[in-house]
Amino acid sequence: MKKHSILLSTVLLCSLFLFSGCNQGQKKEEVPAEAKKEIYLQLYSVRDDIKADYAGTIAKVAEIGYTGVEAAGYNDGQFYGMAPADFRKSIEDAGMEVLSSHAGRPLAEPAADTNWEETWAWWDTAIQAHKDAGMKYLVVAWIPTPKTLADLQAYCDYFNQVGEKCNAAGLRLGYHNHNFEFTEVEGEMIYDYMLNNTDPAKVFFQMDVYWVGEGGKNPVDYFNNYPGRFEVLHIKDELELGKSGKVDFESIYNNAELAGAKYMVVEVERYTGTPFEGIKESYDFLNNAAFVKESYLK
């Protein structure tokens, strides 16, 4: 009886050992894959494809791996001809998030001729639409080149007012640069003047790093001079990311915390191949770069 008991115990122990070994093997196979980096796309990058096949284009953007999108198709309370909630659903159903959109209404020329009743009604509609779409940011993509310092100051005052309205709705107002902002008006650099004369609590700057370089300036110098003002960065190159050698992406990313950057948005305006090839190549460039962190949210 004792022998049978010992034999049974031995069999049970061996079985337990084998079962445990199998479980350990399974656990090794179930180690989660490396977390995906947070990389967003400005949908202007696929502007013609969106016109031809909106749903198919969004699906391809998601398949590449992008975390979310910034819209470039706002008009009269709609995004790409859809109600804000429908636009949001189309992006979220694809597994991405809606971060922001480019929109804006310029002042009259001269600014004193602006119809303020119509202007504020336009902004009320735009702000509500961005809020309903679940966006965090509303970004002004462009202004006419100011002819005088008074024109430039009028835009700074205007953006402070719009930014206050955005804050009240739970949004943040941003301004996206090109290269003309790095010219002077009456002895003042346009970009610097805007940074100095807008309220950081009401207006952030979506720095387009490529256009800064084309304007003869270094993005990191601005991060040092205006820390915390650049909450969203437009990551762009002359063609696909990393091809021109003109943009020091590693230095930009290494100083992202100084900039105050929380989100990085890829924009590809010109391509060597198709737009889809271009946005995939640009995504892969960042996703494979050791200097790019998984997330820049604090």
For the regions a language model picked out, list residue spans one by one.
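Acidic-and-aromatic substrate-binding clefts and catalytic sites of carbohydrate-active enzymes
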Residues: 46-52, 71-83, 105-120, 144-153, ...
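Active-site acidic/histidine proton-transfer and metal-coordination neighborhood
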Residues: 109-204, 276, 296-297
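Hydrophobic faces of well-ordered beta-strands that scaffold small-molecule active sites
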Residues: 37-42, 69-71, 98-103, 138-140, ...
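C-terminal motif of bacterial Sec signal peptides marking the signal peptidase cleavage site
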Residues: 18-21
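Acidic/histidine-rich catalytic cores of soluble enzymes
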Residues: 68-69, 167-253
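N-terminal pre-domain/capping segments
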Residues: 4, 23-136, 284, 288-298
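Bacterial N-terminal signal peptides that target proteins for export
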Residues: 1-8
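Aromatic-rich peripheral "rim/lid" segments of glycoside hydrolase catalytic domains that contact
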Residues: 255-256, 269-298
